[in-house]
Amino acid sequence: MALRVLLLTALTLCHGFNLDTENAMTFQENARGFGQSVVQLQGSRVVVGAPQEIVAANQRGSLYQCDYSTGSCEPIRLQVPVEAVNMSLGLSLAATTSPPQLLACGPTVHQTCSENTYVKGLCFLFGSNLRQQPQKFPEALRGCPQEDSDIAFLIDGSGSIIPHDFRRMKEFVSTVMEQLKKSKTLFSLMQYSEEFRIHFTFKEFQNNPNPRSLVKPITQLLGRTHTATGIRKVVRELFNITNGARKNAFKILVVITDGEKFGDPLGYEDVIPEADREGVIRYVIGVGDAFRSEKSRQELNTIASKPPRDHVFQVNNFEALKTIQNQLREKIFAIEGTQTGSSSSFEHEMSQEGFSAAITSNGPLLSTVGSYDWAGGVFLYTSKEKSTFINMTRVDSDMNDAYLGYAAAIILRNRVQSLVLGAPRYQHIGLVAMFRQNTGMWESNANVKGTQIGAYFGASLCSVDVDSNGSTDLVLIGAPHYYEQTRGGQVSVCPLPRGRARWQCDAVLYGEQGQPWGRFGAALTVLGDVNGDKLTDVAIGAPGEEDNRGAVYLFHGTSGSGISPSHSQRIAGSKLSPRLQYFGQSLSGGQDLTMDGLVDLTVGAQGHVLLLRSQPVLRVKAIMEFNPREVARNVFECNDQVVKGKEAGEVRVCLHVQKSTRDRLREGQIQSVVTYDLALDSGRPHSRAVFNETKNSTRRQTQVLGLTQTCETLKLQLPNCIEDPVSPIVLRLNFSLVGTPLSAFGNLRPVLAEDAQRLFTALFPFEKNCGNDNICQDDLSITFSFMSLDCLVVGGPREFNVTVTVRNDGEDSYRTQVTFFFPLDLSYRKVSTLQNQRSQRSWRLACESASSTEVSGALKSTSCSINHPIFPENSEVTFNITFDVDSKASLGNKLLLKANVTSENNMPRTNKTEFQLELPVKYAVYMVVTSHGVSTKYLNFTASENTSRVMQHQYQVSNLGQRSLPISLVFLVPVRLNQTVIWDRPQVTFSENLSSTCHTKERLPSHSDFLAELRKAPVVNCSIAVCQRIQCDIPFFGIQEEFNATLKGNLSFDWYIKTSHNHLLIVSTAEILFNDSVFTLLPGQGAFVRSQTETKVEPFEVPNPLPLIVGSSVGGLLLLALITAALYKLGFFKRQYKDMMSEGGPPGAEPQ
């Protein structure tokens, strides 16, 4: 057999931490299945299973021992028992270190019993010397099960079956007998109706074992259906020794009927218990439509053995009987396993013992996934001869096909061992059960179920002692067929339950995205502490990733007895070798195979086994110390004769490389190349300090360091004046480390710890001006005013200024800050400084706004820094802060503005550090009242006219502002002049449906001599006439709302004769009033809230038309006479016909 050992150097590194992928050792064999299983032993040995290798005729599977020290593999010679036919040795492996033991199993031993072949298993327990012959478990294969069967047919011959169907039923019986016929099976047959006839007994069949010759002569009885009586007769007469029934044979009754029993004197309750006592296994076949009702189906269930789903067949007609022939045959074949009560199932005939295996303190634990109809279980061997079978069938009847024992793990709690078994096909979702021993009996005390159908939850198990205290903390449960759209497989992290608490899984581990068929979790192993944090790490295989090339994931343990949810390293098989397939299908870890004191990982692939070494883990400690500890004031304070480039001090930088892992490597052998960068004030646009050597704020250094401390001293300078002497100068150090390969240990390379601190900082503070006690005690105060502003008008100018004065009467104040609190409808706009008398220096102010909450309600705040970072002692600053007022703001009747001043000196607050001021608030309104064009503009009358005319004055009122408010509209209307009515009972009406209330009162004129006033101006208004004042209160006048108000009444003319004017103007006025304590008009808008309307009134004389008519008639006649005389004189009226005839041609001439 060819043997090759390859030392692979990966073309590209598998990024991660911290298994060495550059120098992976690969063992390769041509044996089929090599790498299917793998286990580490003490020393440098690895045992590999090749369960598919054909060793000899009827011998399959072999074991190989591979040694890191020799770099070779050799087969383990084993005397395989003759009965171990095709056992697939090496399909499962298990090992312990104390004492050193190896358990190797072949769970596919083929055992032939008569015409049946069963699958069992054998395991071999080795000691530390694999050349010595191992112990065998079980000591011998269990014998073949009982196979004698007596099968009786009870067929319905009642009159409801037509002859053609009866013949089909006989053909069905003959065919089934032919299929079940073998040397240890006997048949008998009874026909029943209301009569009963035994056509042949077991003894007669034994004498003539020809089914067709026995069945063909049978004729139909006809009559009613007495099924219950027929069953009793079969039990008592056919299953009788006198008729050839055998004492130790299985008793099987097959009942074929086409309907419910009818006219039978016996009930099923009279005969079924007797059949159960006699151990008769009953199958019933219901034919036809009669069994569609619930009652008839219940009759079939009553006849059949339990459970009915395994013993009842139902077909639509006799033609369909042939469709169930094979099903019935399989059911009866299954009986020849083991009989239990009235039903039957396999016990251990298909057990596949050793499908998974573990070594307990009591002895080997071998799983039997095929036991009891593949419900599964395990055998715990305390000696070769003594074993205990452990399963869940007694407590969970629905364990069929669960495969309990598919995976097994041992847990240790309080020095007591318990078992954890996986059943990945339990109810299709999978189950993992925990078993403990109680008074000598093993019982399940906790379980956890899967969540996805077909995920194979429990296909792999791994118990983990995270903190290495000797007690198991959690169990990893693999579900390699768990499916998501972008990844396949998952591993649940399940801490052990405490007390009687429910067992739950509190976390789930996944592989990388993009691998839906990855089978992540197909293999699990405890790796040990590979990163030096004293916590156990684990490895998880995903052999289906990258098109079955495979990958292995490394997860670190975490404090609190958990597993990190993200992997620290992913090792792809394709990166190690392009020929690898199913890399990660088996895993084993936790042993030091390379004799360097570090644990190693063994990974199985198809035809290959790879040994991956964990690497020494390093950490770096950095110390940076300044001398002096502070930058002196005379160095950083600038004056008129400033000198640049002053030396600020020096810093001592020390690096100490330390090893975290426990190993056998000598400290003097470990070296690494460390490159570190130093940066001063790296977060600032301009550094305040530089290195004297480079005149730059950064510096890079590369050194080869061992496991010792290395130091260097660097001088620092301040190149410019310091604007910020408060924040210390920050020196940052970050580094990278590359380990030097160790030639004495196969070029093993140290690595930097994954969670190692890579960034270090040190602070170089500035000396403070804080007196001898070095504690700065400022004395801050704040005041402010609204300057000349007496009232804030909302809706007027959008901005207003607040003049603020801040003083410091104490020592230097650090990071002084003024904070204003103001209503939400205000917003900060800008800040500007004012020159004051105490200081001529310029100040740095910067403000920013933020939301804040005070006890009184929601407020906004703006904070202004005063000359950051230092507000010097005995200083005063005055500045304006400008606020913007929303035109729709609602501030009440007063604006309350608060402010305080604070600093990082942490001095207690006083009444000087807080200030507040109130300012009255009014709201600007913009309203207009105008005279409408539809008002009466002109009226006239005659002196003799005693009637009155209707006159109206209309006004349009508009709210053009941004406020709704209540208003009053006041009209002044002249109604009497010198006790004579002018405008009689004027009324006010509105164009809109306004809610208003109007009331009137009279107002006396201001001048009593109205005639004198009229001579000055022909105007009748409230100065000379008695007026009616009409006030209409409107409670709500909305934004952009307008309406018309109309004054309407009768105008009398009697008063006019008391005047001597040709015309007069009647004037009414309208004015808008409002609450001026809340609202106000902007300057220049007062004229728009008042208006007046004028109507011109004048008298006229009615003319007499008679003189005009008479005069016109006489004048017309005289004019006509004159015209006629003139025409006569001119001869207009003379006849001239004769002249016209004489001027014509001779008589009789034709006209021309």
Swiss-Prot record:
Ca(2+) 3 binds at D592, D596, D600. It is a single-pass type I membrane protein. GO terms for biological process: amyloid-beta clearance; cell adhesion; cell adhesion mediated by integrin; cell-cell adhesion; cell-cell adhesion via plasma-membrane adhesion molecules; cell-matrix adhesion; complement receptor mediated signaling pathway; complement-mediated synapse pruning. Changing R77H: Influences susceptibility to SLE. FG-GAP repeats lie at residues 18-75, 76-135, 339-390, 391-442, 443-503, 506-564, 569-629. Gene3D superfamilies: Bicelle-embedded integrin alpha(iib) transmembrane segment, Integrin alpha, N-terminal, Integrin domains. Chain A, domain 2, ntegrin, alpha v. Chain A, domain 3, ntegrin, alpha v. Chain A, domain 4. It is linked to Systemic lupus erythematosus 6: A chronic, relapsing, inflammatory, and often febrile multisystemic disorder of connective tissue, characterized principally by involvement of the skin, joints, kidneys and serosal membranes. It is of unknown etiology, but is thought to represent a failure of the regulatory mechanisms of the autoimmune system. The disease is marked by a wide range of system dysfunctions, an elevated erythrocyte sedimentation rate, and the formation of LE cells in the blood or bone marrow. Belongs to the integrin alpha chain family. This is Integrin alpha-M.
